[in-house]
């Protein structure tokens, strides 16, 4: 039992140390805009996708009703709120970036930090995104959730 408690305490301390990463350790970028709640473009035209989260997507096509075959109204308000929240967080600020990998679309997958706070984690905590279980292993903060 004592070994188990020591292991749990060690794990929690390690996560706390990784979770509160200081933006002083990472290079800084500035963003010119955000496409949605998890993808932005830097002033150097680098497309960055926030690691470990999934935000609402833009609905481009109306779904058809099976009975009448007419387009039904679709709602992009969740998409817009998520994108607006991310824009409010990163616009006009120098943002620390920890590049992780490149995705199949050529975007940089990265964690972003503002004032020692993880931007992806802020999107999740505010309800504008969810943790992507498939990619949660890339971020220490997402593993504990």
Tell me the role of every PLM-derived stretch.
Residues 2-145:
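Small beta-barrel nucleic-acid-binding modules, primarily SNase/OB-fold domains
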């Amino acid at each position: 039992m004592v070994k188990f408690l020591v292991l749990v305490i060690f794990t929690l301390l390690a996560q706390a140390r990784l979770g509160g990463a200081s933006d002083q350790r990472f290079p800084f970028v500035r963003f010119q805009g955000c496409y949605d709640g998890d993808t932005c473009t830097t002033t150097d035209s680098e497309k960055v996708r926030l690691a470990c989260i999934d935000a609402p997507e833009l609905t481009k096509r109306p779904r058809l009703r099976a009975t009448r075959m007419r387009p039904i109204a679709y709602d992009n308000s969740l998409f817009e709120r998520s994108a607006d929240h991310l824009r409010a967080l990163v616009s006009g600020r120098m943002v620390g970036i920890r590049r992780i990998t490149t995705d199949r679309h050529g975007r940089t997958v990265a964690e972003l930090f503002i004032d020692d706070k993880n931007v992806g984690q802020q999107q999740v905590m505010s309800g504008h995104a969810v943790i992507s279980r498939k990619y949660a292993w890339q971020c220490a903060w997402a593993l504990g959730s």
